């Protein structure tokens, strides 16, 4: 039989980079979202600012005031609604042998449509206050990947196409997206309203495009002749990529564009409702290689050469061109514009007691394979400058996930935090999906 696994690996391996996908900064619970509730007081004392619950009255500590801050951060997450952590470890990290039992575990979890996503971020930024306006500037790095794939696609990769002799494998849905870019941005936030409890903010950034790879298809299928003499690809598809023959975490510049972020919040004495719209923008990519087809295409070669580069991540332009052109599909090279993977985030948090705050929200990334991610968090203050933030979420590229945020402040100036999504990976890797972490260091003055 013909070696067709490289076709499907090409369509789905763009996500094979180390690295979920969004995270809320745990240090926010010691700063922007810090619990200001203090000891229970006599409700007749009118000197202190207070807030009352059904049974208790609390005093409110004065809000932390600061002129400027500086922060550096990094994060990497990977998640899937089908592939387990054990499989990800073997396939992506250790490159170890994937035995039949591990393959079958994945097959048993597969559905008609499966997804996987990777998000790697790093950056530094600062902010300074001018009267009631805060001006922000920063530099960020992002490598984002997502894919949807069918159960047949997985079987073709790891079992080959012998089982499909004389049959048609359904590769629908099949969509892949990978983008690597860096952003230099500036923004402002301003407090408005009669009660001075509404914050509006916006950022504008200039984007340096590094790498771009995208596959869109409709009704994709692959037929294998009974005697293995040929393959027939049926689909309407578009394949586009920048010509990166050697993988690099920071590719050469292949395009440029603009991006913007928008922020709104309204604040009560012990609660805040916020809406964020992030990464609204585009990149104009230069000299993008594109293959487009709509119909039936036959391949009669003896063997399909590996069209994935040596590191298993990027395309091999030479072998890819040979494969498509052998079926009569010619490439075009042109400049194209694509939108960035934007995110809508709605959240609400509330301080319940001096030691407990809760927050909940929903996050939606506008890419294939991502479903709205609903989450809830409980912030428990061991002290006023040390907080634990366990969370439970469902959605995104995965299913249910458990995370733990930890944040500690020192001398009211230094904040160190981390967010960990490793418990499922360690405790039950063969039954769970998704892992990652973030770290951040901030200095306020």
Question: How would you describe each model-predicted region?
Answer:
Residues 23-250, 289-318, 416-420, 438, ...:
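A subset of solvent-exposed loop/turn segments in beta-rich extracellular surface proteins, enriched
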């Amino acid at each position: 039989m013909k070696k067709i696994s490289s076709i499907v690996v090409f369509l789905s391996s763009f996500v094979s980079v180390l690295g979920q996908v969004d995270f809320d900064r745990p240090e926010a619970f010691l700063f922007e979202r810090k619990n200001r509730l203090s000891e229970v007081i006599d409700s007749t004392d009118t000197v202190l600012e207070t807030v009352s619950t059904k049974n208790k009255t609390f005093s409110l500590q004065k809000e932390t005031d600061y002129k400027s801050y500086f922060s550096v951060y990094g994060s990497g997450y990977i998640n899937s609604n089908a592939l387990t952590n054990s499989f990800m470890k073997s396939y992506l990290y250790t490159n170890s042998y994937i035995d039949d039992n591990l393959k079958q575990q994945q097959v048993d979890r597969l559905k008609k449509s499966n997804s996987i996503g990777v998000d790697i971020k790093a950056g530094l930024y600062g902010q300074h206050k001018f009267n009631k306006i805060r001006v922000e500037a920063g530099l960020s790095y992002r490598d984002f990947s997502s894919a949807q794939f069918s159960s047949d696609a997985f079987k073709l990769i790891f079992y080959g196409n012998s089982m499909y002799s004389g049959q048609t494998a359904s590769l629908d849905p099949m969509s892949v997206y990978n983008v690597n870019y860096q952003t230099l941005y500036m923004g402002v936030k301003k407090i408005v309203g009669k009660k001075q409890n509404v914050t509006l903010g916006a950022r504008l950034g200039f984007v340096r495009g590094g790498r771009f790879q995208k596959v869109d298809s409709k009704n994709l299928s692959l037929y294998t002749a009974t005697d293995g003499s040929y393959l027939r690809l049926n689909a309407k598809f578009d394949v586009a990529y920048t010509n990166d023959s050697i993988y690099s975490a920071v590719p050469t510049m292949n395009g440029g564009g603009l991006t913007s972020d928008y922020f709104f919040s309204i604040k009560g004495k012990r609660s805040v409702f916020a809406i964020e719209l992030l990464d609204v923008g585009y990149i104009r990519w230069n000299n993008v290689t594109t293959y487009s087809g709509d119909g039936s295409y036959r391949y009669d070669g003896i063997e399909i050469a590996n069209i994935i580069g040596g590191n298993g991540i990027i395309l091999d332009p030479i072998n890819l061109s040979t494969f498509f052109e052998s079926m009569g599909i010619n490439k075009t090279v042109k400049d194209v514009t694509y939108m960035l993977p934007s995110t809508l985030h709605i959240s609400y948090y509330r301080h319940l007691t001096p030691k407990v705050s809760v927050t909940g929200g929903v996050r939606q990334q506008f890419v294939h394979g991502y479903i709205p991610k609903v989450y809830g968090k409980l912030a428990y203050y061991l002290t006023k400058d040390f907080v634990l933030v366990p969370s439970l979420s469902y959605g995104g590229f995965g299913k249910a996930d458990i995370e733990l945020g930890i944040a500690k402040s020192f001398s009211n100036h230094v904040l160190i935090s981390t967010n960990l999504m490793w418990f499922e990976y360690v405790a039950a890797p063969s039954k769970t999906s998704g892992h990652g972490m973030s770290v951040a260091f901030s200095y306020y003055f």
